[in-house]
Protein backbone atom coordinates (compact mmCIF):
# COMPACT_ATOMS: atom_id res chain seq x y z
CA UNK A 1 0.00 0.00 0.00
CA UNK A 2 1.13 3.53 -0.75
CA UNK A 3 0.78 6.33 1.78
CA UNK A 4 2.49 9.67 2.37
CA UNK A 5 3.68 12.74 0.49
CA UNK A 6 7.20 13.17 -0.90
CA UNK A 7 8.95 15.96 -2.80
CA UNK A 8 11.50 14.57 -5.26
CA UNK A 9 13.08 16.69 -7.99
CA UNK A 10 12.83 15.98 -11.70
CA UNK A 11 16.27 16.10 -13.29
CA UNK A 12 17.19 17.55 -16.70
CA UNK A 13 16.75 14.13 -18.35
CA UNK A 14 13.18 13.78 -17.08
CA UNK A 15 14.11 11.29 -14.34
CA UNK A 16 12.32 11.19 -11.02
CA UNK A 17 13.60 9.31 -7.98
CA UNK A 18 10.87 7.24 -6.39
CA UNK A 19 10.54 7.31 -2.59
CA UNK A 20 12.75 4.56 -1.14
CA UNK A 21 9.91 2.97 0.83
CA UNK A 22 8.03 2.16 -2.42
CA UNK A 23 10.89 0.77 -4.49
CA UNK A 24 10.43 -2.87 -3.51
CA UNK A 25 6.74 -2.76 -4.43
CA UNK A 26 7.62 -1.26 -7.84
CA UNK A 27 10.80 -3.23 -8.62
CA UNK A 28 8.88 -5.71 -10.79
CA UNK A 29 7.84 -2.94 -13.14
CA UNK A 30 5.37 -0.13 -13.07
CA UNK A 31 2.98 1.58 -15.39
CA UNK A 32 2.83 5.37 -15.65
CA UNK A 33 -0.31 6.85 -17.11
CA UNK A 34 -2.22 10.11 -17.23
CA UNK A 35 -4.54 10.55 -14.29
CA UNK A 36 -7.17 13.05 -13.23
CA UNK A 37 -6.47 16.68 -12.43
CA UNK A 38 -3.40 16.76 -14.70
CA UNK A 39 -1.38 14.41 -12.56
CA UNK A 40 0.24 11.07 -13.36
CA UNK A 41 -0.65 7.70 -11.86
CA UNK A 42 1.99 5.07 -11.13
CA UNK A 43 0.67 1.52 -10.74
CA UNK A 44 2.61 -1.64 -9.92
CA UNK A 45 2.58 -3.70 -13.11
CA UNK A 46 0.67 -6.68 -11.65
CA UNK A 47 -2.13 -4.53 -10.25
CA UNK A 48 -2.33 -2.56 -13.50
CA UNK A 49 -2.76 -5.81 -15.45
CA UNK A 50 -5.65 -6.79 -13.15
CA UNK A 51 -7.29 -3.40 -13.66
CA UNK A 52 -6.93 -3.69 -17.45
CA UNK A 53 -8.50 -7.16 -17.39
CA UNK A 54 -11.55 -5.81 -15.54
CA UNK A 55 -11.95 -2.86 -17.91
CA UNK A 56 -11.45 -5.11 -20.95
CA UNK A 57 -14.19 -7.45 -19.76
CA UNK A 58 -16.62 -4.54 -19.55
CA UNK A 59 -15.52 -3.21 -22.94
CA UNK A 60 -16.20 -6.60 -24.53
CA UNK A 61 -19.72 -6.54 -23.16
CA UNK A 62 -20.50 -3.57 -25.36
CA UNK A 63 -19.87 -0.72 -22.96
CA UNK A 64 -18.73 2.14 -25.24
CA UNK A 65 -17.46 4.24 -22.32
CA UNK A 66 -15.27 1.35 -21.13
CA UNK A 67 -13.89 0.91 -24.67
CA UNK A 68 -13.09 4.62 -24.96
CA UNK A 69 -11.45 4.67 -21.53
CA UNK A 70 -9.40 1.56 -22.32
CA UNK A 71 -8.30 3.04 -25.64
CA UNK A 72 -7.14 6.29 -24.03
CA UNK A 73 -5.55 4.49 -21.09
CA UNK A 74 -3.52 2.20 -23.35
CA UNK A 75 -2.37 5.09 -25.52
CA UNK A 76 -1.19 7.14 -22.54
CA UNK A 77 0.56 4.38 -20.56
CA UNK A 78 4.32 3.90 -20.37
CA UNK A 79 5.96 0.84 -18.82
CA UNK A 80 8.98 1.60 -16.64
CA UNK A 81 11.50 -0.26 -14.51
CA UNK A 82 13.31 1.76 -11.84
CA UNK A 83 17.08 1.96 -12.32
CA UNK A 84 19.62 1.11 -9.59
CA UNK A 85 19.04 4.52 -7.97
CA UNK A 86 15.25 4.07 -7.96
CA UNK A 87 14.67 6.53 -10.81
CA UNK A 88 12.15 6.35 -13.61
CA UNK A 89 12.18 8.44 -16.78
CA UNK A 90 8.95 10.28 -17.44
CA UNK A 91 8.11 10.72 -21.11
CA UNK A 92 7.96 14.22 -22.59
CA UNK A 93 4.21 13.72 -23.14
CA UNK A 94 3.66 12.81 -19.49
CA UNK A 95 5.76 15.75 -18.31
CA UNK A 96 3.78 18.09 -20.57
CA UNK A 97 0.40 16.69 -19.49
CA UNK A 98 1.19 17.08 -15.77
CA UNK A 99 3.08 20.37 -16.25
CA UNK A 100 6.11 18.85 -14.53
CA UNK A 101 9.21 20.98 -14.29
CA UNK A 102 11.70 20.47 -11.47
CA UNK A 103 9.72 20.45 -8.23
CA UNK A 104 7.38 17.47 -7.98
CA UNK A 105 5.19 15.85 -5.37
CA UNK A 106 4.64 12.10 -5.14
CA UNK A 107 1.60 11.10 -3.11
CA UNK A 108 0.48 7.70 -1.97
CA UNK A 109 -3.05 6.91 -3.11
CA UNK A 110 -3.45 3.59 -1.31
CA UNK A 111 -3.04 1.20 -4.27
CA UNK A 112 -1.06 3.50 -6.58
CA UNK A 113 1.06 6.66 -6.54
CA UNK A 114 0.34 10.06 -8.03
CA UNK A 115 2.94 12.44 -9.43
CA UNK A 116 2.07 16.13 -9.37
CA UNK A 117 3.76 19.39 -10.21
CA UNK A 118 4.49 20.89 -6.77
CA UNK A 119 2.59 24.12 -7.48
CA UNK A 120 -0.41 22.25 -8.90
CA UNK A 121 -0.48 20.02 -5.81
CA UNK A 122 -0.40 23.05 -3.52
CA UNK A 123 -3.26 24.67 -5.44
CA UNK A 124 -5.25 21.42 -5.38
CA UNK A 125 -4.74 21.13 -1.62
CA UNK A 126 -5.82 24.73 -1.01
CA UNK A 127 -8.88 24.35 -3.24
CA UNK A 128 -10.07 21.16 -1.55
CA UNK A 129 -8.91 21.69 2.02
CA UNK A 130 -12.11 23.17 3.41
CA UNK A 131 -14.22 20.59 1.58
CA UNK A 132 -12.23 17.66 2.99
CA UNK A 133 -14.40 17.17 6.06
CA UNK A 134 -17.67 17.40 4.15
CA UNK A 135 -16.36 15.12 1.41
CA UNK A 136 -15.24 12.49 3.91
CA UNK A 137 -18.65 12.56 5.59
CA UNK A 138 -20.41 12.19 2.25
CA UNK A 139 -18.08 9.58 0.77
CA UNK A 140 -17.56 7.49 3.88
CA UNK A 141 -20.76 8.00 5.82
CA UNK A 142 -20.84 5.74 8.85
CA UNK A 143 -17.46 4.09 8.17
CA UNK A 144 -15.54 6.79 10.05
UniProtKB/Swiss-Prot annotation:
InterPro entries: MraZ, MraZ_C, MraZ_dom, MraZ_N, MraZ_sf, SpoVT-AbrB_dom, SpoVT-AbrB_sf. SUPFAM superfamilies: AbrB/MazE/MraZ-like (SSF89447). One of its GO terms (cellular component) is nucleoid. It is found in: Cytoplasm, Nucleoid. The keyword Lyase does not apply. CDD domains: MraZ_C (cd16321), MraZ_N (cd16320). Transmembrane segments: none annotated. It comes from the Bacteria. Keywords: Cytoplasm, DNA-binding, Repeat, Transcription, Transcription regulation. Residues 5-47, 77-120 form the SpoVT-AbrB domain. Its main location: cytoplasm. GO terms for molecular function: DNA-binding transcription factor activity; transcription cis-regulatory region binding. GO terms for biological process: negative regulation of DNA-templated transcription initiation. Pfam families: MraZ (PF02381). Forms oligomers. Belongs to the MraZ family. This is Transcriptional regulator MraZ. The lineage of its organism: Bacteria, Bacillati, Actinomycetota, Actinomycetes, Mycobacteriales. The gene is mraZ.
Amino acid sequence: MFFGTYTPKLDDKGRLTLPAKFRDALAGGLMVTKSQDHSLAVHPRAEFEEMIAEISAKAKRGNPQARAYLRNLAASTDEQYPDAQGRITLSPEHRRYANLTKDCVVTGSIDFLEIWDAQAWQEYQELHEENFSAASDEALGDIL
